[in-house]
Amino acid sequence: MQTIKCVVVGDGAVGKTCLLISYTTSKFPADYVPTVFDNYAVTVMIGDEPFTLGLFDTAGQEDYDRLRPLSYPSTDVFLVCFSVISPASFENVKEKWFPEVHHHCPGVPIIIVGTQTDLRNDDVILQRLHRQKLSPITQEQGEKLAKELRAVKYVECSALTQRGLKTVFDEAIVAALEPPVIKKSKKCTIL
């Protein structure tokens, strides 16, 4: 049985572990437990063929910046996560996570995942963001960033309600099995 290695990265507390636990067990975890490194495996059918989807959770905290890349070798697809209610985590997709993944694994497909969509319209969250002169990240902003960074795709989900959750991993499988052809820039190069 072929194995697909999918590594999940992103800032601490954006919902990476909840995403994985909710997907693999269909239950939302009650407590926040910061991750150092964990992995999960699920069997998925693609057509008539079974695949093992190996899901590797990583710690987003800076304390683990040197340890985290040890989980990167042989990765087939990365999920770079941010919380739609954390503009700072969205900014770090571009400033930290994409550069880190590209440095260690150039050419490996990347999907950007907006998490915690169930909180996008939460009054308490909206008030907190408003006080900071911020607002939740929109789907359009996520799609624009994915295009700008040449990610395979942008997808959103809620681990709590499971809305969009299966799509995240379906897209990861497709990206791993059919890596995109990187188009060369059509700009003229003068030597």
UniProtKB/Swiss-Prot annotation:
UniProt-annotated binding residues for GTP = 10-17, 57-61, 115-118
State the CDD domains in the record. Cdc42
Q: What is this protein called?
A: Cell division control protein 42 homolog
A GO MF label: GTP binding
Q: Provide the topology term for how it sits in the membrane.
A: Lipid-anchor
**From its record, what is one biological process in GO terms?**
septin ring organization
Asked if the record carries the keyword Disulfide bond, the reply is no
SMART domains, A to Z: RAB (SM00175), RAN (SM00176), RAS (SM00173), RHO (SM00174)
Q: What does this protein do?
A: Involved in hyphal formation, virulence, morphogenesis.
Task: Give the similarity note.
Answer: Belongs to the small GTPase superfamily. Rho family. CDC42 subfamily.
Gene source species: Candida albicans (strain SC5314 / ATCC MYA-2876)
Compartments (UniProt record): Cell membrane
Q: Which residues carry this modification: Cysteine methyl ester?
A: C188
Q: Which GO terms describe its cellular component?
A: cell septum; cellular bud neck; cellular bud tip; extracellular vesicle; fungal-type vacuole membrane; hyphal tip; hyphal tip polarisome; incipient cellular bud site
Q: What is its main location?
A: membrane
Q: List where the motif Effector region lies.
A: 32-40
